[in-house]
Swiss-Prot record:
Protein name per Swiss-Prot or TrEMBL: Homologous-pairing protein 2
Pfam families cross-referenced by the UniProt entry: TBPIP
Recorded superkingdom: Eukaryota
Similarity comment: Belongs to the HOP2 family.
Gene this protein is translated from: HOP2
Length: 214
């Protein structure tokens, strides 16, 4: 049985003059401009970006291809070919700058198309006009139920309950103050016992004399 290929085996990538010839042949076959990233991607990583960049630089220096810089991006294309065009076609429509402009226009159109599609998807997610009436009606009914429940609570409320609530809150405040006061006294007492008696285990000592955890 033949040994299985390891999944992490990498395809052999072109380098040096082989990479230059591969890229030049590709640009000639496509006869349109590309960035280095496009070339690497379209060649399915047969060359690395570093190798492709060096190969393109050599090809330009040897005048085997041409390049043009747009901002931070360098676009590469094969040298202009003597292509036989139909008599009704203006050759000026196929020079480097025109093709590049058309390519940029296409990118813009694709971007506009994507934006329009996102807007359409957003609109289609909204409910239909007929459904809006039902949704509004349901929301109004829910609001009426809440208002009815609130009114019922207000009608059943006994003013005397206000005094009861206030008294409970006042007593709770006094109780919390008393708890805080007694807790402080207890802690001071424990500190005094600790300094005076100096037990080996304070927790066991407190448990023996009946103190609970504070």
């Amino acid at each position: 049985m033949a040994p299985k290929k390891k999944s992490n085996d990498r395809a052999i990538q072109a380098k040096g003059s082989e990479a230059e010839q591969l890229i030049e042949d590709y640009l000639v076959s496509q006869y349109k401009p590309f960035s280095v990233n496009d070339i690497v991607q379209n060649l399915h990583n047969k060359v690395t970006k570093t190798t492709a960049t060096k190969a393109l630089e050599n090809l330009v220096n040897e005048k085997r291809i041409v390049s043009k810089t747009f901002g931070k991006i360098i676009i590469y294309s094969c040298n202009e070919q003597d292509t036989a065009l139909p008599s009704n076609i203006d050759p000026s429509q196929f020079d480097f700058e025109t093709v590049l402009q058309l390519r940029n226009d296409l990118i813009e159109l694709e971007r506009d198309k994507s934006t329009a599609k996102d807007a359409l998807d957003s609109v289609t997610k909204e409910p239909e006009n007929e459904d809006l009436l039902t949704i509004i009606e349901n929301e109004e009914n829910e609001l009426k139920k809440i208002e009815s429940k609130l009114q019922s609570l207000q009608d059943d409320w006994d003013p005397a309950n206000d005094e009861i609530v206030k008294r409970i809150m006042s007593e709770d405040t006094l109780l919390q103050k008393e708890i805080t006061k007694r807790s402080k006294i207890c802690k001071n007492l424990i500190a005094t016992i600790k300094d005076s008696v100096c037990p080996k285990n304070m927790n066991e000592f407190l448990e023996e004399i009946g103190f609970e955890d504070i």
